[in-house]
Amino acid sequence: DCPSGWSSYEGHCYRVFNEPKNWADAERFCKLQPKHSHLV
């Protein structure tokens, strides 16, 4: 099960964030998201 606002695909949870970020800021942002989130 994925958190509210997230989508499931092949057993993984994904969510699109539209705010532009550089790589370092995006990585920090992802670490604040639910467990097992990945920077894509």
From Swiss-Prot:
GO cellular component terms, A-Z: extracellular region
Alphabetical list of Gene3D superfamilies matching this protein: Mannose-Binding Protein A, subunit A (3.10.100.10)
Keywords, sorted A to Z: Disulfide bond, Hemostasis impairing toxin, Secreted, Toxin
Annotated signal peptide: none
Localization, UniProt: Secreted
Disulfide bonds: 2-13
Summary of the tissues where the protein is detected: Expressed by the venom gland.
GO molecular function: toxin activity
Predominant location category: secreted
Protein's job: Interferes with one step of hemostasis (modulation of platelet aggregation, or coagulation cascade, for example).
Similarity section: Belongs to the snaclec family.
Subunit annotation: Dimer (non-covalently linked) of heterodimers of subunits alpha and beta (disulfide-linked).
Full protein name: Snaclec LmrLEC-1
Organism: Lachesis muta rhombeata
Lineage: Eukaryota, Metazoa, Chordata, Craniata, Vertebrata
